[in-house]
Amino acid sequence: MSNQQQQQQQQQQPRQHPQPHPHHHHHHLHHHHQQQPGQHSEFPLPEGWDIARDFDGKTYYIDHINKKTTWLDPRDRYTKPQSFEDCVGDELPVGWEEAYDSNIGRYYINHIAQSTQLEDPRQEWKSVQEQMLSDYLSAAQDQLENKREMYDVKQQRLNLAQEEYNHLNKLAASRSSLCSSSSSMSRHDPELLRADLMLARERVRQLKQELTHITNDISYTERGMNTLYSVGEKINARKNGCYDIAEVQAIREEMLKVHKSLVSGEKVREELMRSLVQIKNELSRQQINEENAELMSAASPFDRVCVASQTDLCGAGEHLNGGARFAEMAKTKLQYAEWRKHIKKLQQQLADHVERIEPGQLESDKDRILLIQEKEKLLNDLNSISLKSRSAEEKQVIQQTRHKLEEDLKEAYEATNTCIANRLRFHEEKQLLLDKLQEALKSTKLLEERLKSFSSESTFSISSGSSLGSLSTASSKSALSFTDIYIDPFAVGESPIDVVDLQRRSQRLFQQHQRLPPVHPALQQQQQTQPLASSEVSLSPRSSLSMETPPASPMKYNAVADQPQAQAKLKEEPTYANALPALPTIPAPPAYAAPPAIPLALAAVRAHPYDLDSTVLDCMMLEAKLQKLNLGSPLNLNGPLSPISEKPSLLDLPQEMLSRSSSTSNTRSVSAAVSNESVAGDSGVFEASRAHLPRKELAQVQIGLKYLKQEGVLVVSLERANNLSALWTATTDNSQVYLRAALLPNSLTSIRTKALSDFQKPVFNDTFAVPISLDKLLTKSLQVTVVSMTGQKEEIIGTVQISMAEFNPEDSTLKWYNVLSSKFIPSFESLDLPSTSAAAAAAAVAASNSNNNNSNTNNREESSDESTITSSQTSTLTRNQAPPLELQAQIAEELPEHVRHNEQQCSDDDDDDDEEEDEQQLVGTLGLTHSGCMLDAYLENMKQEYADKETNTDCAFPPEKLRSQSQLLDDRPVKRSQTFTPSAAVSKNRYNCRLNRSDSDSAMHFGVTPHTFHRGAVERRSLRFQPKATKSVTKLHHNHIPRTSLDLELDLQAQHSKLFFLNDQISKLQNLKEVLQKACDNKDPLIAAWAIENEEFQRLVARADPAKFPEERLLQKLLMKTTKEIHKLRKTKVPKGAPDLVSFKEKISFFTRKGMSVPELPIEFMHPDADAIEEEEEDDNDDEEDNVVETAIAINTALVASSNRNKNLSEHHHRSTDGALSKLAATLTPAINPAPVSAPIPVAVSVPVAAPLADEAKPEQQRYDYVVDRNYGVEV
């Protein structure tokens, strides 16, 4: 083709496809994406065309020949595909353009058809949505039919109950019993007859109330289905089924107005509910007499608890010294990090689990099971009808009805077991994950409180809203998100319907009448396993709790009766039902095998936050870290320790140190300390090694305690001992040993055992009774001393001190206690210390005596403990092998250097951030721990020793006076901190410098930041001063999930539905408040009894009860945030550009999901003159028999009709679709009219449920007032 012919063809193209003339193109405010002129620079413009720009830089083209302007480049016809079939990748055909609006998002312009639309024309998502909507409406129609059938069956039950009541009423009036269906006793006893009459009356009232609930459910479902039908019809009526941008903007503005009304209406609802709480409390006070009223007012939820008289209100770590406090803080932070990881994992599992359960399917399954239960109850009612006085025709009708019901129940059970068995299993797994998530949030909140208590003396702070990995989901968008519209805050955290329990109960009811085929194996196993109490669950069938270790003692009298049953329960395998929710198993991180597990009871944590010594725990953590860091051989912890505590505080215990049994009863527990023979971390089975319990370097005493309340006597049993030779080496063969015990302080008497010559395994078996009141006992400490006797000379060689503050008088205990050697206690007369003494005091004394006694010997056979004398422990955990003072500085000096060396090697690897954090957490724990065992074992692996650098200003080391003990080591090299320079040369004496840290140094995030030291760096400052991250600006080309006009219309109708039901709830709450207030003023006992006993009303007021603990309210907020986080996680799994099927299913199921219900008072309370039961006239005795026949025939007819309905659901669905628009005027909410949307909801004005609209015939097109330009977009 020649150039002249090509130019002629280019000149003819605009004439063949004339572009429409744009009007007021300078009013276009949207940012368009189009081919720039530079992209067609190799092709010249056709003759007669020109390029121009408007005031905002938008390029347009002028056709001088036809005197028109257009946005389309005339050269696009040669460079762009001609149709969607020719497009490759993200291309658009000629005539289409993609644009972006800051409020709406992406939209598309069709210049050829002169229209705009929200949908991407390249995707078929709209047709998929329409098919999903049609499928859901069909399923919802089935669900509605189940509800209607349930209504029919319950109506027949009501007729039978009404008939029985009228029959008993006649008997009570006539005192005759010819045709009575009651027992022979009540036929002649007027009192029993009146009791039967009252029961029948109550049964009729209950059935009427249930009928009212079913009616409300049916109306709610019908209204939601009609809304969905109308949405579908409205979208199909549009051209191409799409809204243009003008309508999209108007709908968005309307949604924002509705949201404002919802916010104000929710405030009104909360205020009404708080008023109902006050009225309910007042009615409760009126139900009791004046004496009890005073007691109730004292326990009023509105009273404030005074804590001025309490003495222990300090933080969790204030009673510890500086070193122990920082060690505890480091461990707590490590636990907090592990719980955060566990929460993230649970969120991911829940996000994965949502896709396995269809939205709305649980409600449908519940209706099926409830329908089966109603038919079972109807069958029972029919079986209870007496046939003695019935005619042959009546008997035949009743028996046919029974047979029909039995056949229906058979079919229903078979369908239920095959259809919903897997769904119920998925639902149960989801509930288990939700329970674990709730408990994990509680645990995280507890740890945050502990960290905040530590920050009372330090600059560290933590906030759930500003910390890394926070659950905060605040969005910078002004538009409403999916969670804002479709997630009800009142429904989050609420206990959902236990459909599995309904299924089991219905099966048990039906099995009373007929044996069914075997149930699905999963459900059958769930039925056989019953929940156990938390104190009776064992996670291993071979749990060592079921055996005696060591054999039983005299202290086990009165405690043998329940042992076989308890052991049988302990051997049961755990299931979903009996798994302990309070101790969720946290998966161990790759490099750290000791994840935390803490108790969730607030009282337990606050009362005894340090029930166990942390020294051995730090040793175990050090051993794991040393193995990872390759610093040396594992620490020699000498096997497992003895079972010394049966109810430990699990807050400080890593997972691998916990017993595999969760028993909290006072059976003998077995230590789960790490040893070479422990397989608890691998197989879940832990067997105690008896051969390793008595070690040469471990001295122990077995002590039993029991309190007899009636006699007021404490029974102390000194049973036996192990390895007392480790405390003292006998010089002669006639040495003996005995035990002496006394209650301190102010003990006037003491008790002692017989003297024995066996120091290895002496068996005393002496029991003593000490008269003492319980109040005084809890303030005492039991001190047991080990005394050696050689001839006439006696010497105290060890002691055990037990705080009675934690003794449980309800249980008997038998425990092994470590014995503290006398070498570490300067004077045993001074053991009568206050019960709040800390572990560090004993540690300092132990270190001092260790240096004096062991400076020239290698004897390490002392069996002692640093922190025996503490109030928060019932026993000791560790053996004290205290090192010299300078060794503590050596480990604080050497280990950080090694860690810094590792950090330099791993600084470029992003995957090692968590590992570096664990290493620094370890450094903070090690440098501040007084564990002699740890230091001695580490000393054996050290190759070079350094002097004390003295850069820590806290009390991490023993007092200053003890430094003279180590002057002989001054020739060692001095290693100073790199953050200062000495002002004088280092002399032969040790150079000690104490550094006062600056603000940026002391306020750093303790042991978490993996960065190298930079003074004043942002990472070293407290998180409370960290500036907030700037909000990210929405980019033009972002990965988005496609939205359609159907999505937009569903969002709008969902907002209107929420507003409608909120108005209805406010109206009902106002009416309920008025009635209850009048009853409160008039002191009506009936209404007061209803308010106290009605479960639905109690659940309602519990939502807004100010007596609810702040922790529960905060938990609700965390659950709401977590729900949003789960939704975001699920959205991230959707492929790029793919539609979110699950979210759309949740949208359409929202309209048939019932929200919060407000209870209604019985009609007899509202209208006292009206009788709730319609009594029959007694003019003819034959009417009763006719009614029975009519009832049975009606039941049979209803059952046949229901089966026919199930066969013709498709026809009914089409009929419902055709009649949906005709029903719309009577069923849709007033929120369709935009008039009430813009105004806030007043307190006293509400929209009734069935209130007709005066202007409902107003056409919807008048809702939008726009001037639409087909080329440019829209002028609003």
UniProtKB/Swiss-Prot annotation:
Listed Acidic residues bias regions: 906-920
Domain WW: 43-76, 90-123
Major subcellular site: cytoplasm
Ranges of compositional bias, category Basic residues: 18-34
UniProt keyword terms in alphabetical order: Cell membrane, Coiled coil, Cytoplasm, Membrane, Phosphoprotein, Repeat, Transcription, Transcription regulation
A Pfam family assignment: C2
Protein's UniProt keywords contain Ribonucleoprotein: no
UniProt GO cellular component terms: apical plasma membrane; cytoplasm
Summary of the function given for this chain in its UniProt record: Regulator of the Hippo/SWH (Sav/Wts/Hpo) signaling pathway, a signaling pathway that plays a pivotal role in organ size control and tumor suppression by restricting proliferation and promoting apoptosis. The core of this pathway is composed of a kinase cascade wherein Hippo (Hpo), in complex with its regulatory protein Salvador (Sav), phosphorylates and activates Warts (Wts) in complex with its regulatory protein Mats, which in turn phosphorylates and inactivates the Yorkie (Yki) oncoprotein. Kibra acts synergistically along with Ex and Mer to regulate the Hippo signaling pathway.
Oligomeric form and interacting partners: Forms a complex with Mer and Ex. Interacts (via domain WW 1) with Ex (via RXPPXY motif). Interacts with Mer, Sav, Hpo and Wts.
Protein's name according to its UniProt entry: Protein kibra
Lineage, highest ranks first: Eukaryota, Metazoa, Ecdysozoa, Arthropoda, Hexapoda
Gene (UniProt): Kibra
